[in-house]
């Protein structure tokens, strides 16, 4: 599958998308179905959950946590060049397999997995002479996909089923953003790590900012 998730311009595209993009797309589907009121009601409930999209390749990947691993503590046994190499490797890394997440936080580094290939496509604006423009797209590997976490809801399932044909992201009129929907239960190893109450560092899976109550 191929998609365009804009990063500010047509000639740039991200590998994944944030929850607000999906929420907007679901709202449009709900309006088309005449179920906007029901969707708004569900979205306003405390148990409503909708995360950003992340890669799935033989298992779920997580976003790289900010501030980890820590390279600011001097280790006299490590060469300065090696420290710089590790810092560069960590900077390039975008997503971490769930099973390697703890190891990464504790300082173990590894190469970033390839989930898709970014291409630049040149298109012509109809009925306008010489109006060429470029669109950046991401084509996902056959063994890669994207996943989101959401609370169980018949309406959400119905909206997502419809959205797979409408598509998500930019340039949908060109056929981008369509997908094959699969609904799965969260693995216990993942579900057990999700929490709303925790004394210690946590990482949000939805692009958001904290507020004081």
Model-based region annotation:
Residues 1-213:
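Conserved active-site/ligand-binding neighborhood in enzyme cores
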């Amino acid at each position: 599958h191929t998609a365009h998730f804009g990063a500010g311009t047509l000639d740039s595209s991200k590998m994944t998308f944030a929850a607000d993009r999906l929420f907007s797309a679901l709202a449009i589907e709900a309006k088309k179905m005449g179920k906007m009121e029901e969707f708004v009601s569900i979205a306003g409930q405390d148990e409503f959950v909708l995360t950003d999209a992340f890669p799935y390749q033989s298992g779920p990947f997580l976003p790289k946590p900010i501030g980890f691993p820590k390279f600011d503590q001097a280790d006299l046994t490590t060469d300065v060049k090696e420290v710089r190499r590790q810092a560069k490797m960590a900077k390039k890394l975008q997503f971490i397999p769930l099973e390697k997440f703890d190891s990464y936080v504790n300082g173990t580094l590894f190469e970033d997995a390839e989930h898709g290939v970014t291409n630049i496509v040149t298109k012509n604006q109809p009925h306008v002479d010489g109006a060429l423009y470029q669109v950046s797209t991401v084509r996902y590997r056959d063994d890669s996909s994207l996943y989101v976490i959401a609370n169980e809801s018949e309406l959400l399932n119905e909206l997502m089923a419809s959205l797979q044909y409408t598509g998500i992201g930019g340039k949908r009129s060109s056929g981008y953003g369509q997908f094959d929907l699969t609904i799965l239960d969260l693995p216990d190893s993942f579900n057990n790590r999700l929490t709303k109450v925790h004394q210690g560092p946590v990482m949000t899976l939805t692009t958001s900012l904290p507020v004081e109550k």
